[in-house]
Curated annotation (Swiss-Prot):
Residues 20-229 are extracellular. The chain crosses the membrane at residues 230-253. The lineage of its organism: Eukaryota, Metazoa, Chordata, Craniata, Vertebrata. GO terms for molecular function: lipid binding; metal ion binding; peptide hormone binding; prolactin receptor activity; protein kinase binding. Residues 345-354 have a biased composition (Low complexity). Keywords: Disulfide bond, Glycoprotein, Membrane, Metal-binding, Receptor, Repeat, Signal, Transmembrane, Transmembrane helix, Zinc. This is Prolactin receptor. The WSXWS motif appears to be necessary for proper protein folding and thereby efficient intracellular transport and cell-surface receptor binding. Residues 398-408 have a biased composition (Polar residues). It comes from Mus musculus (Mouse).
Length: 608
């Protein structure tokens, strides 16, 4: 027994003296899976003890008692073990150990617990691309692009990859690392022009390890950034040169026309009769006169110069035809009644200057001027005013007593109540005819006058003065001397009268219409049957159309009263105007039946 123990100690001492020992303890370096389907484990062997040593990898799965040896020691290289899909399971924990054995003994590494899900280390990104670009502000940058690893399934979402890039200039020692997240492209700014840069990329899954750095690529940043396609600049330059040549040629040939088109001349005044000197001097009144514009009429404060309207009784039974017609209408023709409420231009009455303007200028008048019947009685009618012939002007005044009056212009205090019709502007239009009408007298009385009413009798009085003819070339011819013993009446009353003028007080002065044979009726002895006329209308030639009244009453009394009127004393020129103005409305009225009529010849003499 003691001899056997001594033998063993002798052998051991001899082995130690020769340098042989059991193998050292191996160490598992790492286990990695590129795609969660396969994985590989690497280890570092210990000392071999001077003897040949065998290494083996054994594993077991958690929850299982069986131990398995590595299926493939060659695929991944020496000191490694490759697990194919057949031997790889996810959501399982592997317990892995490495054993070393030689003639002197054996040794075992520490166990390593591996979960395939957390040991993924993908391949580096592929297809790395570098490009230098320029922004609109001429600032350059480096554009880096790459693709995910080929083995990993990124499109289906089996992996979620994150990326990093690193770059440095060729002369630098340290790398500049940029994390890009899940993007596969990145822009690097603030690069130094004229230097060469080195770029690399890598990736890692959401749970795992960073891949190794990929292939290294380099690029040089140019000093002056220029476009690669220089043909674009060449084309632009050629087109610009052609356009410039065309413009120079056009200006050389048609320089004046082009300058006129670009800078047109200032047009001058094209108004006929327009005086530029008046415009430059700034005299607006002379300029308006040159253009034919009327200046503003002067204002007048004399209210008594305006005549409100003319009122003449209208015969509702009979009507004469216009002056150009020589026949009277038939019995079936009815007179046209006027609407008493129609507007007659009352605004003309309110104008202070309309009367003078319209009485001075000849104007075109309406074909007819109808005047409605006014039957309102004055408050203070004048009566029994004897005629006062003026020897200087040979102007008679007639008077007839009546209970009704027709509105005529009076002084401001003697105006009677008037109907709100008939503006004086319309009356002045009738009075604005040329002066050559002074040569006209009473036209030939129409033979086919409507029959007078038998009830009117044959004793109507004509309180009218005969008028002698005026020369056509003189307007201001005096009237013949008047007879002082009584009024002179016509053998046959006149049918037409013509407006002579309108005096400053707005009173109409009438003349008898001249006959066709240029002869006037001479005054003669009144016949047994007399007729008085009333205004029926106004023709185109401003002639009043008169119609005899068939309802004249009490003509005998009127004739007697007219004959008994004594002549008044001689008046001077200023008193004559006032007397003719105030006494016209009462002295020239005749009451025939229940209507009033005016004697045109009386006004003709009084306002001449």
């Amino acid at each position: 027994m003691s001899s056997a123990l001594a033998y063993m100690l002798l052998v051991l001492s001899i082995s130690l003296l020769n340098g042989q020992s059991p193998p050292g303890k191996p160490e598992i370096h790492k286990c990695r899976s590129p795609d969660k389907e396969t994985f590989t484990c690497w280890w570092n062997p210990g000392s071999d003890g001077g003897l040949p040593t065998n290494y083996s990898l054994t594993y077991s799965k958690e929850g299982e008692k069986n131990t398995y040896e590595c299926p493939d020691y060659k695929t991944s290289g020496p000191n490694s073990c490759f697990f194919s899909k057949q031997y790889t399971s996810i959501w399982k924990i592997y317990i892995i150990t490495v054993n070393a054995t030689n003639e002197m003994g054996s040794s075992t590494s520490d166990p390593l617990y591996v979960d395939v899900t957390y040991i993924v280390e993908p391949e580096p990104p592929r297809n790395l691309t570098l490009e230098v670009k320029q922004l609109k502000d001429k600032k350059t940058y480096l554009w880096v692009k790459w693709l995910p690893p080929t083995i990993t399934d990124v499109k289906t979402g089996w992996f979620t990859m994150e990326y990093e890039i690193r770059l440095k200039s060729e002369e630098a020692d340290e790398w500049e690392i940029h994390f890009t997240g899940h993007q596969t492209q990145f822009k690097v700014f603030d690069l130094y022009p004229g230097q060469k840069y080195l770029v690399q990329t890598r990736c890692k899954p959401d749970h795992g390890y960073w891949s190794r750095w990929g292939q290294e690529k380099s690029i040089e940043i140019p000093n002056d950034f220029t476009l690669k396609d220089t043909t674009v600049w060449i084309i632009v330059a050629v087109l610009s040169a052609v356009i410039c040549l065309i413009m120079v040629w056009a200006v050389a040939l048609k320089g004046y026309s082009m300058m006129t088109c670009i800078f047109p001349p200032v047009p001058g005044p094209k108004i006929k009769g327009f005086d530029t000197h008046l415009l430059e001097k700034g005299k607006s009144e002379e300029l308006l006169s040159a253009l034919g514009c009327q200046d503003f009429p002067p204002t007048s404060d004399c209210e008594d110069l305006l005549v409100e309207f003319l009122e003449v009784d209208d015969n509702e039974d009979e009507r004469l035809m216009p002056s150009h017609s020589k026949e009277y209408p038939g019995q079936g023709v009815k007179p046209t009644h006027l609407d008493p409420d129609s507007d007659s231009g009352h605004g003309s009455y309110d104008s202070h200057s309309l009367l003078s303007e319209k009485c001075e200028e000849p104007q075109a008048y309406p074909p007819a001027f109808h005047i409605p019947e006014i039957t309102e009685k004055p408050e203070n009618p004048e009566a029994n005013i004897p005629p006062t012939p003026n020897p200087q002007n040979n102007t008679p005044n007639c008077h007839t007593d009546t209970s009704k009056s027709t509105t005529w212009p009076l002084p401001p205090g003697q105006h009677t109540r008037r109907s709100p019709y008939h503006s004086i502007a319309d009356v002045c239009k009738l009075a604005g005819s040329p002066g050559d009408t002074l040569d006209s007298f009473l036209d030939k009385a129409e033979e086919n006058v409507l029959k007078l009413s038998e009830d009117a009798g044959e004793e109507e009085v004509a309180v009218q003065e005969g008028a002698k003819s005026f020369p056509s070339d003189k307007q201001n011819t005096s009237w013949p001397p008047l007879q002082e013993k009584g009024p002179i009446v016509y053998a046959k009353p006149p049918d037409y009268v013509e407006i002579h003028k309108v005096n400053k007080d707005g009173v109409l002065s009438l003349l008898p219409k001249q006959r066709e044979n240029h002869q006037t009726e001479n005054p003669g002895v009144p016949e047994t049957s007399k007729e008085y006329a009333k205004v029926s209308g106004v023709t185109d030639n401003n002639i009043l159309v008169l119609v005899p009244d068939s309802r004249a009453q009490n003509t005998a009394l009127l004739e007697e009263s007219a004959k008994k009127v004594p002549p008044s004393l001689e008046q001077n020129q200023s008193e004559k105007d006032l007397a003719s103005f105030t006494a016209t409305s009462s002295n020239c009225r005749l009451q025939l039946g229940r209507l009033d009529y005016l004697d045109p010849t009386c006004f003709m003499h009084s306002f001449h």
